[in-house]
């Protein structure tokens, strides 16, 4: 079975089940801004976790090279997220059919040409008018290294370097849309960063599945009708207010009000993919792990081979920036679009 690059589902679910996803979203009630994780050691925090994507967004103005104040760009990307399921832990009763959706399981097998698929997480992303998601690749995992204990920018650079495929745990990601909105298209680059971008409208009851650890992707701006985006900062919450309405709250203050059809609601599903029981067991038993020290030594040796690093010892921050600049190359923006 040859691997596939992506698969699109239209429709994804029978309509009654799709409407139930909206009721589940409403029932969850409150959605916080996506909180950046931290790593509990000095090297892990020399840079913000997704410094690579954030700096590229500020530097370039995003996919359409829009120039705005840093504070505005931050509000545009302080979107809302909550987790519905983690491993076998169901945090939102009723999400189980989506968590074990057979069409996702079958497509994941095709994406990585691996027959064993283990659902890992289900989470919701909600963007309000004026928000977008900068083009990026997701944080991969390796045997022995993951985002809970290692810098996210390092994991991303490791994957883009191509030097650590032996240890990578393939992950398939599905993104499903419910209710729909104007704008907020899913953009992805299935032919690589130099290829043409593909866009999918955020239409109700549709989905796409692909390898988001490898394929650059993002979310175009949700239509705002020229309305100014509210000053959304970490700590803000998107709260369901009943009768199809939502409000953004921060410190007891209501910053904005929206209705279904204005906000972009998506549910993401991620799963680990294994070739056989031995590969899965190697993850569980840590029998063939890569360490951070090993990863850094490998990257530094490769940088020297590329004549991008001398024999000197760089400060941690400078080394981190050198790694990001060399290995994580983003698609070019469309100037003047």
Description of each model-found segment:
Residues 5, 9-13, 92-96, 100, ...:
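Conserved aromatic-histidine-acidic binding/catalytic patches
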Residues 170, 181-336:
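Catalytic core of Fe(II)/2-oxoglutarate
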Residues 122-124, 131-133, 170-176, 183-186, ...:
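Conserved active-site beta-strand-loop modules that form the wall/rim of enzyme catalytic pockets
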Residues 163-168, 176-179, 258:
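Short, conserved, surface-exposed binding loops centered on an aromatic residue
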Residues 29-55, 117, 131-149, 216-238:
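Internal, charge-rich low-complexity segments
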Residues 8-10, 116-125, 185-188, 209-210, ...:
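A structural signal for short, well-ordered beta-strand segments and their strand-loop junctions
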Residues 57-147, 151, 157-167:
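Signature of the catalytic double-stranded beta-helix
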Residues 1-102, 259-337:
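N-terminal auxiliary "cap/dimerization" subdomain that precedes the catalytic jelly-roll/cupin core
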């Amino acid at each position: 079975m040859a691997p596939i690059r992506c698969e699109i589902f239209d429709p994804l679910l029978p309509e009654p089940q799709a409407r139930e996803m909206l009721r589940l979203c409403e029932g969850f009630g409150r959605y916080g801004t996506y909180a950046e994780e931290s790593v509990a050691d000095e090297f892990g925090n020399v840079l913000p976790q997704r410094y690579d994507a954030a700096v590229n967004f500020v530097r370039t103005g995003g996919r359409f090279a829009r120039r705005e104040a840093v504070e505005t760009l931050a509000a545009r990307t302080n979107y809302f997220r909550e987790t519905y399921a983690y491993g076998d832990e169901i945090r939102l009763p009723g999400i189980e059919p989506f968590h074990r959706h057979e069409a996702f399981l079958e497509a994941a097998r095709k994406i990585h040409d691996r027959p064993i698929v283990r659902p890992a997480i289900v989470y919701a992303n909600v963007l309000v008018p004026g928000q977008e998601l900068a083009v990026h690749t997701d944080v991969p995992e390796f045997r022995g290294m993951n985002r809970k204990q290692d810098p996210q920018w390092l994991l991303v650079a490791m994957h883009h370097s191509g030097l650590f495929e032996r240890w990578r745990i393939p992950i398939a990601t599905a993104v499903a849309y419910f209710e729909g909105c104007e704008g907020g298209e899913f953009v992805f680059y299935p032919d690589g960063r130099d290829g043409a971008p593909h866009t999918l409208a955020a239409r109700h009851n549709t989905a796409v599945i692909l390898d988001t650890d490898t394929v650059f992707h993002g979310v175009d701006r949700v239509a705002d009708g020229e309305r100014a985006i509210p000053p959304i900062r970490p700590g803000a919450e998107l709260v369901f207010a009943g009768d199809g309405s939502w409000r953004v709250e921060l410190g007891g203050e209501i910053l904005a009000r929206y209705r279904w059809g204005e906000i972009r609601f998506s549910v993401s599903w991620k799963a680990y993919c294994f070739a056989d029981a031995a590969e899965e067991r190697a993850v569980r038993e840590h029998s063939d792990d890569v360490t951070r020290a090993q990863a850094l030594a490998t990257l530094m040796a490769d940088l020297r081979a590329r004549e991008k690093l001398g024999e000197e010892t760089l400060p941690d921050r400078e080394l981190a920036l050198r790694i990001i600049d060399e290995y994580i190359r983003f698609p070019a923006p469309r100037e003047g679009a």
